[in-house]
C-alpha cells in the first residue's frame, strides 16, 4: 500500500495541511503560537506553556499571540517547529517519520530558510523524504496551467510570479508587502473613524470577519464613493459577539481599494494591478502575450467579489490595446496553493523528485537547492 505524502502549506495567516491526492486540505488553522501572559495561578490545571492554532485563538484573552511567519517568510523557527508538530500530531494525527512531506515556500525565500526547513524535517521529525515547492507555482498547477502569471495575495504578503513552462522566473518576481493583515488593520482604523472602537488582538479577529463577510472591490472607486454618499443602498449591518449591531458603508470597498491604491495605507508602492504589469514587463517580449492571457489569482486576499473585473479593467488600460487579457479566478483559490501541492505530490512522475533522508545524510541541507527549483 502506497504511503500518502503529506502536503503542508504554511501561510503567514493560516496553515493548510492534508494528504496528497485529496481535493482539499483536512486541516486549516491559524499560524499562531500563544503563550500565557501570566504565570498560571491554577496550578495543576493542565495549563500548557504554549498553544497553537485554534486553541491559541480561543484562549487569546489570556495569551500573547505570535505569528512565526511574517510576510510569507519564517522568522521564528522554535514557534514554526511547534506549528509543524501540531500539524502532524494533533491535526493530521500521523507519524511524520512514515510519510514524505511536501512543504511550500514564499517566492524569493532566502536560501538559508530552505535549508533550515529541510534540516528540521529530517532531523526533528525524521521524515523519510521531503520537497519544497514555490507557492505561486503550485497555484498555477492547480489551475491546470504551466505558463502564466500568478498574483498570490494572502495574509502577510503579495507576490506577482511569472511562470513559464513550470518554472518561476525569479528576475521578474515582485513582492508587495501589503496583504490581508494590512487590510484588516486598515479596516480597524476606518471603522474607528466611524466611531466604533476596535483595538485589542481579540477585536482584530472580529474586524477580520467583517472584512471577509462584507468587503468587496469597486469597479470604479469614485463612482462607488458617490453612490455611498448619496444613498444607503451600500450599507450593511453586522452583529458583534456582544449583540451590538454596527453599520458598515463605504468602508466595505474602501478597505480592499488599498490593494489598488496602497497610498491609502501610507505606502509608496504601486497597486497590485501595476505590480502585475511591471512583472510582465520584466519578462521576455515573446512570452508576455501568454502571461497576459493567463493571469491567475490565488490566496485569501483575492477572494473579494469584484476583484477579477477590476484587475481586468486596470490591466486593459495599462497593456497594449490589442492585447488579450484574461483573469482567472478559480472559486477554490483560497486553497489553490495547497491543491497544487496535492496534485504534484500524487503525480507518479514526481516520485523521483523527493529529497530522501539518505540524500540528506550524504549531502546535508544544501541538497534542497539542487533538487527543488
UniProtKB/Swiss-Prot annotation:
CDD domains: ASKHA_NBD_actin
Localization annotation: Cytoplasm, Cytoskeleton
Cited InterPro entries: Actin, Actin/actin-like_CS, Actin_CS, ATPase_NBD
Coiled-coil boundaries: none
GO molecular function: ATP binding; hydrolase activity
UniProt catalytic activity: ATP + H2O = ADP + phosphate + H(+)
EC number in record: 3.6.4.-
EC class (word): hydrolase
GO cellular component, one term: cytoskeleton
Entries under Gene3D superfamilies matching the protein: 3.30.420.40, Actin, Chain A, domain 4
Record bears the keyword Ubl conjugation: no
Main location: cytoplasm
Superkingdom of the source species: Eukaryota
Entry keyword set: ATP-binding, Cytoplasm, Cytoskeleton, Hydrolase, Nucleotide-binding
Family (UniProt): Belongs to the actin family.
Classification via PANTHER family: ACTIN
Function noted in UniProt: Actins are highly conserved proteins that are involved in various types of cell motility and are ubiquitously expressed in all eukaryotic cells.
Protein name from the UniProt record: Actin-6
Naturally occurring in which organism (per UniProt): Dibothriocephalus dendriticus
UniProt gene name: ACT6
Amino acid at each position: 500500500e502506497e504511503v500518502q505524502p503529506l502536503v503542508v502549506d504554511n501561510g503567514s495567516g493560516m496553515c493548510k495541511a492534508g494528504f496528497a491526492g485529496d481535493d482539499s486540505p483536512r486541516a486549516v488553522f491559524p499560524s499562531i503560537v500563544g503563550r500565557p501572559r501570566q504565570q498560571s495561578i491554577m496550578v495543576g490545571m493542565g495549563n500548557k506553556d504554549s498553544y497553537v492554532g485554534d486553541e491559541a485563538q480561543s484562549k487569546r484573552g489570556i495569551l500573547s499571540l505570535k505569528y512565526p511567519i511574517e510576510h510569507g517568510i519564517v522568522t521564528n523557527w522554535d514557534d514554526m517547529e511547534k506549528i509543524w508538530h501540531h500539524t502532524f500530531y494533533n491535526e493530521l494525527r500521523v507519524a511524520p517519520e512514515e510519510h514524505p512531506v511536501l512543504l511550500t515556500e514564499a517566492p524569493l525565500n532566502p536560501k538559508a530558510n530552505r535549508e533550515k526547513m529541510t534540516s528540521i524535517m529530517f532531523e526533528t521529525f525524521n521524515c523519510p523524504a521531503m520537497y519544497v515547492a514555490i507557492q505561486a507555482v503550485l497555484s498555477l498547477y492547480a489551475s491546470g496551467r504551466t505558463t502564466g502569471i500568478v498574483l498570490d495575495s494572502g495574509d502577510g504578503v503579495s507576490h506577482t510570479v511569472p511562470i513559464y513552462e513550470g518554472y518561476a522566473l525569479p528576475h521578474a518576481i515582485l513582492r508587495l508587502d501589503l496583504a490581508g493583515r494590512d487590510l484588516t488593520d486598515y479596516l480597524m482604523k476606518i471603522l474607528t473613524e466611524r466611531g466604533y472602537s476596535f483595538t485589542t488582538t481579540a477585536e482584530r479577529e472580529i474586524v477580520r470577519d467583517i472584512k471577509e463577510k462584507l468587503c468587496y472591490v469597486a469597479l470604479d472607486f469614485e463612482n462607488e464613493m458617490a453612490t455611498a454618499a448619496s444613498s444607503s443602498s451600500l450599507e450593511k449591518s453586522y452583529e458583534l459577539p456582544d449583540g451590538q449591531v454596527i453599520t458598515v458603508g463605504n468602508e466595505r470597498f474602501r478597505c480592499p481599494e488599498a490593494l489598488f491604491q496602497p497610498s491609502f495605507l501610507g505606502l509608496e508602492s504601486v497597486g497590485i494591478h501595476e505590480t502585475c504589469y511591471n512583472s510582465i514587463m520584466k519578462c521576455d517580449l515573446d512570452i508576455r502575450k501568454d502571461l497576459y492571457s493567463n493571469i491567475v489569482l490565488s490566496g485569501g486576499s483575492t477572494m473579494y467579489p469584484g476583484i477579477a473585473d477590476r484587475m481586468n479593467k486596470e490591466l486593459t488600460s495599462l497593456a497594449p490595446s490589442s492585447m488579450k487579457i484574461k483573469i482567472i479566478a478559480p472559486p477554490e483559490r483560497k486553497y489553490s496553493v495547497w491543491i497544487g501541492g496535492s496534485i504534484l505530490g500524487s503525480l507518479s512522475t514526481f516520485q523521483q523528485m523527493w529529497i530522501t533522508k539518505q540524500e540528506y545524510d550524504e549531502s546535508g541541507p544544501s541538497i534542497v537547492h539542487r533538487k527543488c527549483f
